[in-house]
Design a protein with these regions (language model features):
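Flanking helices and flexible, charged tails adjoining ferredoxin-like Fe-S electron-transfer domains
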Residues: 1-4, 47-155, 321, 325-366
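Short, flexible loop segments at boundaries between secondary-structure elements
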Residues: 183-204, 331, 335
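Long, compositionally biased charged/polar accessory segments in the mid-to-C-terminal portions
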Residues: 103-106, 211-366
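Gly/Ser/Thr-rich loops at beta-strand to alpha-helix junctions
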Residues: 88-91, 114, 161-171, 191-193
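Ferredoxin-like iron-sulfur electron-transfer modules
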Residues: 1-19, 29-51, 214-215, 244-253
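Iron-sulfur cluster-binding cysteine motifs and their immediate structural context
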Residues: 20-37, 41-43, 53-70, 275-276
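Local cysteine-cluster metal-coordination motifs and their immediate loop/turn environment
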Residues: 13-28, 50-62, 164-170, 258-270
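A short alpha->loop->secondary-structure connector
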Residues: 128, 176-187
Length: 366
């Protein structure tokens, strides 16, 4: 059986791993397979392939979907402080998700499974919504979730799909035709770290503790929103530090462990394809200090009329502040541009299997 390493859709440098090609293939001959860095790329069984061209047609890097025009920008806080405390920023995603669930729809987003891997899942009850809440700084596995979303839309139910901008692009290209029952929320994305690096970190912490890691909190707010910590728990021990000091997060935030395509994101700077974009509203303590209580504020970019309608449906459960794109991007660089890959990135992945992540931090960042 002949298997080609990668479909020549976009170049490997540009491939986001969105998985639209694997979902659309009518013969199931495309598999998303991890490369030596741990990122998923498409592989095709050429003996099964009938050259239908569908995979090329749905590649969002070859054929970009139509973009929205930015309509409005807000700072926003969920009125429920308990929800806000367990959210990464201001808890607005939960309000959007609850609204769709109350309308009889389903919500799709990234969740941690029993092995602490990150993958996209469907949620159809408010009780299960917490698993989607909060940032997960690992590229999530899409699997066949686009296919499941299409089936639900065809059944006439609403779907709120959340993910990175490239995942939203992949979904929309896969669906081909727009659906009034589909609402999309993307997150302003610094880049997606390698699952291989993430699991290496979990394994090294487990070795140090003598027991497995059982819980991960990427953005714990016990010390406040701005001083948030990244924490890893075993049954008896806790590991972690502020997000700028923790080993795994340092590699991520310094653009060492992220996917190659993230160095030149095609979907930031008002190029989102989602109805709503959400992010941390960093710097609001300087711009609007009266609005900041260090419990978290969401930057909300409304990109479509459907997004505006969804925000209107939840506005009575939130506190909103009108702002603009320039202010929202002033202290959150990822809103408006990508940061280049770290010059030490190639060295990092070349020697990843030889050293611990702590040793790699010393070699690459100190």
């Amino acid at each position: 059986m002949e298997v080609k390493d990668m479909i020549e859709l976009s170049s490997k440098q540009n491939c986001t791993g969105c998985s639209a090609c694997a979902n659309i293939c009518p013969r199931g001959c495309i598999r998303m397979t991890a490369d030596e860095e741990g990122f998923l790329y498409p592989k095709v069984n050429e003996e099964m392939c009938m050259d239908c061209g569908l995979c090329e047609n749905v590649c969002p890097m070859l054929h970009k979907p139509q973009q929205h025009e930015l309509l409005a920008v807000y700072g926003a806080k969920n009125n429920d402080d308990a929800v806000r405390f367990t959210s990464s920023s201001g808890g607005m995603f939960t309000l959007f998700a609850e609204e769709i669930l109350q309308q009889g729809g389903v919500v799709v987003g990234a969740a941690l499974d029993e092995q602490l891997a990150v993958q996209h899942v469907l949620v159809d009850s408010i009780a299960d919504l917490p698993k989607l809440r909060g940032s997960k700084y690992v590229q999530s596995k899409i699997g066949k979730i686009y296919s499941e979303v299409r089936q639900i839309l065809r059944a006439g139910r609403k779907v709120l799909f959340s993910g990175t901008p490239c995942q939203i692009a992949g979904l929309k290209k896969y669906l081909v035709k727009p659906s009034e029952n589909l609402l999309t929320v993307d997150v302003v994305c610094h880049g997606v770290p390698s699952p291989k690096v993430y699991h290496k970190h979990l394994q090294e912490l487990a070795q140090e503790a003598g027991e497995p890691v059982v819980q991960v909190k990427f953005r714990d707010k016990a010390k406040g929103w701005k001083q948030g910590e990244t924490l890893f728990f075993t049954e008896h021990q806790r590991f972690g530090a502020s997000k700028r000091q923790e080993t795994y997060m340092r590699l991520f935030l310094n653009n060492i462990s992220i996917r190659p395509s993230c160095g030149e994101c095609a979907f930031n700077n008002k190029r989102s394809l989602a109805d709503i974009t959400i992010a941390d509203y960093w710097g609001i303590d300087k711009q609007y200090p009266e609005f900041d209580d260090d419990k978290g504020v969401t930057l909300v970019l409304v990109n479509s009329e459907a997004g505006a309608e969804l925000l209107a449906q939840v506005k009575d459960k939130a506190e909103l502040l009108t702002t603009d794109f320039a202010k929202g991007a002033e202290y959150n660089v990822a809103v408006s541009k990508s940061l280049p890959l770290n010059p030490k990135r190639a060295f990092f992945f070349e020697h990843l299997d030889e050293y611990t992540l702590k040793e790699m931090v010393e070699r690459c960042l100190e």
